[in-house]
A protein has these predicted regions:
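Active-site hotspot residues in diverse enzymes, especially metal/ion-binding acidic/histidine motifs
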Residues: 1-263
Length: 263
């Protein structure tokens, strides 16, 4: 399996730029699914997590209100917090290390894109952050001397996709790792070289520029089976759509209807 050299803080948290994460994502895809770097296509994120990274997959309700979408378990534990809808109460279950738990809400209709991004996010935690969270029970550490143990898991909230590096001065290691997991999910689901191939081969002659932005984001979303929002963000990040451009799914629906009538 591909193993990049990653600079880390003393805590074990990685220090990575967006460009470095793009390289890591591209190399993961190249090692796992080489054909996906020859022609743009959907990445099988379930197969990557389970077969390539060796993660076990589980589905639970992680909260009563959908605030948590996914969870990565790094150490064996019998204290995984879940929600029991039948009894309307919190509960605990057991899970082994290297388990990814996805909220059952994401198995519902029209949730495929959120599911795929969340699986990519949790796979990102597994690939990048084991050194920070993992605990060797055969070694005595400072945690043992203090009567504590490291957190056995990381819970991922629904709002982390909105994290912006421009506010990063006050970020903790955990904040940075959420951002890194988001960035790696994007880099794996939409490998940089393949997004560039789609964008540079995309042509809609006679179409107004703002409509071109919408059409390009819709094309990327379709090719890689990701959300329109994720595709637009990726294209902005790579410079194909201006950062200040506002992309609305409501306007997309109107434009898509108009394009269907004219092409």
């Amino acid at each position: 399996m591909y193993r990049p050299e990653i600079k880390r803080k003393k805590s074990g948290a990685p220090v990575l730029s967006r460009k470095e994460i793009d390289v890591i994502g591209q190399n993961i895809v190249g090692d796992f699914m080489p054909e996906a770097l020859k022609s743009p296509q959907e990445i099988d994120i379930d197969l990557l997590a389970q077969d390539y990274l060796g993660m076990d997959q589980d589905f639970q309700y992680l909260s009563h209100c959908g605030v948590y979408l996914g969870m990565t378990v790094f150490n064996d534990t019998d204290k995984v917090p879940v929600y029991d809808p039948q009894n309307n109460c919190a509960d605990y279950i057991s899970a082994k290390a290297h388990t990814v738990i996805i909220d059952k809400m994401l198995l519902e209709e029209n949730q495929e894109h959120r599911y795929r991004f969340t699986m990519g996010h949790e796979a990102g935690h597994e690939f990048l952050h084991k050194e920070y969270f993992a605990y060797d029970p055969d070694q005595i550490t400072l945690f043992d001397l203090m009567g504590e143990t490291p957190a056995p898991m990381v819970q991922c909230r629904v709002d982390t996709k909105k994290m912006d590096c421009r506010t990063s001065k006050s970020w903790t290691d955990r904040d940075w790792m959420e951002w890194q997991a988001n960035a790696l999910s994007s880099a794996v689901l939409m490998p940089v070289s393949m997004v560039r191939m789609v964008a540079e081969n995309f042509k809609r002659p006679g179409l107004h520029q703002i409509f071109c932005h919408y059409a390009l984001a819709e094309e990327v979303a379709s090719v890689f089976n990701v959300s329109f929002e994720a595709a637009g963000y990726r294209l902005k990040q790579l410079g194909y759509i201006p950062q200040e451009a506002q992309l609305s799914t409501d306007i997309l629906n109107m434009i898509s209807f108009d394009l269907a009538c004219n092409y």
